[in-house]
Amino acid sequence: MNNPIAAIVLAAGKGTRMKSDLHKVLHPIAGRPMLLHLMASVDELSPAKKVVVVGDKADQLEAALSGTAELAVQEPQLGTGHAVRQAEAALSGFDGDVLILYGDVPFVPAATMRAMLDRLGASDAPAVVVLAFEPADPLQYGRVITDGDRVVKMVEHKDATDAERAVRLCNSGLMAARARDLFALLARVTDDNAAKEFYLVDIVNIANADGRLCAVVKTDPADVGGINSRAELAAAEAQWQAFRREEAMAAGASLRAPETVWFSWDTQLGRDVTIEPNVVFGPGVKIADGATIRAFSHIEGATIGAGCEVGPFARLRPGTVLGEKAKIGNFVEVKKAVLGAGAKANHLTYLGDATVGAGANIGAGTITCNYDGYFKHQTQIGERAFIGSNSALVAPVKIGADAIVAAGSTVTLDVGDGELRIVRGEQLVKPGWADRFHDAMRKKKAAEQKK
């Protein structure tokens, strides 16, 4: 039977290289805090316990986690071994397997965590499992010296011999151990080093000295990249986006210029979706089969139906719902608006706090005037209604089914089904007036030039 699982996530560092008032592990990747990327992978294992070790800006972490994990405070911060020990009280009475993870290493797949736990549960019963990798440039990393998959020694780069530096297998910092072994070993770690800190890696050396097996599991370097600076954050974003683009195309979406499309962590695409260059998706976007998103569109919090066309240069904001084959064209902004099947707003329009019936046509320059300075109000446009260009619909207002609003109208009262509403000033015709005006102005200008 599988042992229960606990995850200890270290997130107590100050993150000074980020130069930010926001906690390092809360900086977003694809619109989601990096810590929550990691926690989502942890959740795939159905852990019995999750403990996040916090220090600086603990209140921010508490808010972000929203009660989904227990918090343990590390104060003062005396190294990684000391940090893990702060989780001991939260795991009191827990007799299972423990994963030790880092909040600034967000891309560890659940499958890699499972591989570590499987190795921990093997018949040779290792005391500690170390996750290691082979980076392109191992210069900065501690080395993992092995005999087969047995860890013989772990050594920091600065302390390594030339022969040890030639080894390319490096320590990711991630480990797994049984709870009873982990805390017993940590109790024996000392701060007998120049930094006067308690190092987590020392549990491997202690276990080896006891004659216990310490095993290694290898992973791809991309899975264990740490984020300590804005440059590394940007690199992590690029890594995530590249993976997601490949995933989207493999699932049946067409990306005309993949490197220019930016997804959110939760973007959902149907089959045969086409995305043109320079499109940005914020959180909460669902796109059904066969929709087309044209260039330079920005979409967040929107549900887009099958066969819809959006853009170019469109902005869909939270609360937008487009029915099947609806069209939103260039320089159209939509917020908290529901458009029925086949409804169209092809250019230069704002639709906010509105419902638009199936087959309705919204002319260029139409504005739903939804805000009175204090409250938002609803505009309701019926099925097959036609709103002429340059119209202002002052909410709250209802436009009936099959109604027509003439171009240039400012509508403040409801329009019934099938009605024509024209709201314009009187059109005056003054024959010859323009000729007389130009003649007078030319004479005046000539007189001024003679002075």
Curated annotation (Swiss-Prot):
- Report the cofactors: Mg(2+)
Q: What would be one Gene Ontology cellular-component term for the protein?
A: membrane
The record's annotation in InterPro entries points to: Bifunctional_GlmU, GlmU-like, GlmU_C_LbH, Hexapep, Hexapep_transf_CS, MobA-like_NTP_Trfase, Nucleotide-diphossugar_trans, Trimer_LpxA-like_sf
Q: What is its EC number?
A: 2.7.7.23, 2.3.1.157
Positions of the UniProt region annotated as Pyrophosphorylase: 1-230
The answer to whether UniProt assigns keyword Glycoprotein to this entry is no
Q: Kindly state the subunit structure of this protein.
A: Homotrimer.
Function field: Catalyzes the last two sequential reactions in the de novo biosynthetic pathway for UDP-N-acetylglucosamine (UDP-GlcNAc). The C-terminal domain catalyzes the transfer of acetyl group from acetyl coenzyme A to glucosamine-1-phosphate (GlcN-1-P) to produce N-acetylglucosamine-1-phosphate (GlcNAc-1-P), which is converted into UDP-GlcNAc by the transfer of uridine 5-monophosphate (from uridine 5-triphosphate), a reaction catalyzed by the N-terminal domain.
Q: What is this protein called?
A: Bifunctional protein GlmU
Give the gene symbol: glmU
